[in-house]
Amino acid sequence: LTIYFYHTRLTRESYEEWKDYKFPGHILYGLPLLEKYGIRSVMHKYKAFPSRLKLMLYATKEILCCKEPYEVLYGTSFRGLELIILLRALGLYRKPIVIWHHTALKTSSRKIRERISRFFYKGIDHMFLFSKKLIKDSLATGKAPEEKLQLIHWGPDLAFYDHLLQTMPDRKPEGFISTGKENRDVDTMLQAFCATDQQLDLYIAPTNGSVNYQQIIERFCLPDSVRVHYTDGVIPYLLAQKVARKSCVVKIGRAH
């Protein structure tokens, strides 16, 4: 079996880094394991675009013009694949589409948007989700039958982190750290740490989607014990090193 492996970040480069324990395998969504099962990957040539539309147009062109044969389109997200999925729903794209869906499917109060959404999901042949709760909530929308949804236990690449710790034998963990950018409740986190003298290092992107974390953070008068570091791009190895030097990881999710 040959798949077209679509990822929303650099793939081939990250895969090579994974081989040298410089990139955690779980961010590659199974790519390091595929060869073991006789699955060959045609890797998407990723490019970053500030515009969602430009990303969709680029991804559509790359996929439709791909000269290497493949049987299945496998996406770690549907971001950028929207036009291909609509073509599949229309019967104009013939390859099965399998994607990771990172949230539960939702219903819209707007009738036109809801109709488009229901048609859109007809173009996805199979979806992987992270929990039974996400599957249950998705089924409640009626947009996908149960046989299309599959629970996959996604977790950290332990070999990557074990190897990292072996390279830091003299580390002395101290303080708190928080990393990441998706649905982070920085309001609650900063309120809590501003009320203590505990040391916190926060590594976060200035913005993520419609959320401007920098604006939220700048409303606070932060004590010296709370340090904010704005990140750019995907830097899992660097952040893993930072985390390994801390006593505790803090993550407070923002309600959807």
Which stretches of residues belong to each language-model region?
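A conserved mid-protein helix/loop that constitutes part of the nucleotide-sugar donor-binding site
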Residues: 181-195
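Acidic anion/phosphate-binding donor-loop and adjacent secondary structure
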Residues: 139, 156-173, 184-187
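Short His-centered aromatic/hydrophobic patch
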Residues: 75-80
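Conserved small/polar residues in nucleotide/adenosyl-binding loops
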Residues: 255-256
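Nucleotide-activated donor-binding/catalytic signature segment of Leloir-type glycosyltransferases, i.e.
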Residues: 204, 213-248
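Membrane-proximal helix-turn-helix segments that form the acceptor-binding/catalytic region
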Residues: 64-68, 108-127
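A short, active-site helix/loop in glycosyltransferases that binds the activated sugar's phosphate group
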Residues: 125-149, 156-161
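A short, histidine- and acid-enriched strand-loop-helix "catalytic/donor-clamping" loop
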Residues: 48, 95-111
